[in-house]
Amino acid sequence: MGRLRSAAMGALPVFRIELGGQAGHSELHTSLSKNLYPMARLYHVPLSPFCRKVRLVLAEKKIDVELIEERYWEADPDFLRRNPAGKVPILKMNGRTMPDSMAICEYLEEKNPTPPLMPQSAEGRYEVRRLVAWFDDKFHQEVTSKLLYERVNKKLMNQGYPDSRNVKEGAKAIKYHLDYMAWLLDHRRWLAGDSMSIADFAAASHLSALDYNSDVDWTRSDTVKDWYAKIKSRPAFRSILADQVPGFPPAKHYNDLDF
């Protein structure tokens, strides 16, 4: 797909996927024509699981995207004009500005259904949406917000030190969620059924963000570990594994496909 290069845009890093040479330009033109997309622009935060979910869908569907890191907590007026809710991700595409990670993912699925990341049946789509809500609501509230927010976000936002009680609660809660994932994967090939879906990307987005700080006990379930290894080894995951947050080096195994 080319290489990911960082460029400057004000104080924010910008990442562009570039293809070199005449053949590269031809490949880019063919890719854009095939997918009917101009260059998309995604405002994101590297360790945000909601942003990662959108990034994975974009990459899996081979949609070229410009990544712009947005320090949303600074409430920049230009950013708030794009999304008054003050949240990321925000996708700019086809003249539209679109917030909300799941709404973005479903938009991308409907506009570019190959490869499919939602089942054909109403029951299958329901199950994908149920599990995405499970991870983006319940898992996020009980685990991600108590580990990632306390250990990383607080420092980035200058909001003080981690609350040890929240960290302990998150470390305890993740065990239950890993067990639930193991149960699902004992009965299914992927989390929502026989095919990989947005539900798998939602779960992997949260776990990868936590794994950056080594907050996932992969010895708890070989089933979950094997599932994550499959997701982690996909080309769509490469930019996720390349993420770096200043002041927070990733765990040594974070980008190791064999971890």
What are the functions of these language-model segments?
Residues 5-7, 20-24, 33:
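Short Gly/Ser/Thr- and charged-rich N-terminal loops/segments
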Residues 81, 233, 242:
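Phosphate-coordinating loops and pocket residues in cytosolic domains that bind phosphorylated ligands
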Residues 1-14:
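Extreme N-terminal basic, low-complexity initiation segments
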Residues 16, 27-168, 182, 258:
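GST-like domain detector, emphasizing the conserved glutathione-binding G-site
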